[in-house]
Amino acid sequence: MLEEGRFLLERIRKKSLLLILLIFFLVSFESNDKNIDKISNFLNNFKTISANFIQLDNNGNPTTGNIKIKRPGKMRIEYNKPVSNLIISDGIKVALINKKSSSINLYSLNQIPIKVLLSNDFSLENYQVINYKEVNNIIEIEITSKKDKELGSITFIFEHRPMQIKKWIINEINGSKTEIFLSDVFINKKLDNNFFRIIDPRKIPFGRKE
C-alpha cells in the first residue's frame, strides 16, 4: 500500500513537472512571437535611419563612418579617412565609388543583402528565421530570403526596451561576415534626397568636391 502511494505521488510529481515545463515553453514561445512581431513592425514601419558605425570585416579589422537610409531603396554609406570608399543606392542601382582613384562600380539593388532594410514593404513572410535568441534586454534574430538564399543571411541585434536597432551582421554563403555596430542612431529624421544622388567621379571637374 505504501509503495502504491509512493508510486502515485511520483506520477503526480512528474506530471506537475511536465505541466510546469509546458507552461514555461508556451510562455516563452508567446514572448518570442510578440518580440518577433515588434521587430517585424520596426523593420516595416521606419522611414529613415541615420547613424554612425564601426564596421568589422571578417578578420576583425575596423573601419568607421556614417550610414543614411531612406526608404524606399535609398542608402548612403560614407567611410571616414583613410578609407576613401563611398556606397550610394539611389533606389534603382548601387554605386561603389572610390573617391581617391575616382573609380565607380555599379550593381543591382537586388545584389546586396542589406536590401531588407531598404524595402518599403518588408514582410517576414518573405524570409526564413534561421536563429532567434533573447538574453536580458538584447534580441538577436537571423533571417535569410526564401527566394535569394545565395545572398546569405543577415543578423539583426536589437535592444528590447525600448525597441532600438544596435547592430547587424551580414553573413555571406562563403562563410565570411561583416559586422556593423551602430551609434548615435536617429530614426525617421528628415534626409535630403541629394544625399542619395549617384555622381560619376570621373565626370566631376578637377578640383571640385561633391
Located regions from the model:
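N-terminal secretory signal peptides that target proteins for export/translocation
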Residues: 1-13
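Sec-dependent signal peptide recognition
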Residues: 13-22
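Hydrophobic h-region of N-terminal signal peptides that target proteins for export
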Residues: 21-30
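Cleaved targeting-peptide boundary
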Residues: 30-37
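A short, Trp-centered hydrophobic/proline-enriched beta-strand micro-motif
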Residues: 41-60, 68
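Short hydrophobic/aromatic-rich beta-strand segments that constitute the beta-sheet cores
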Residues: 51-53, 75-79, 94-97, 141, ...
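An acidic-aromatic
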Residues: 66-116, 178
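Gly/Pro-enriched, hydrophobic low-complexity segments
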Residues: 125-208
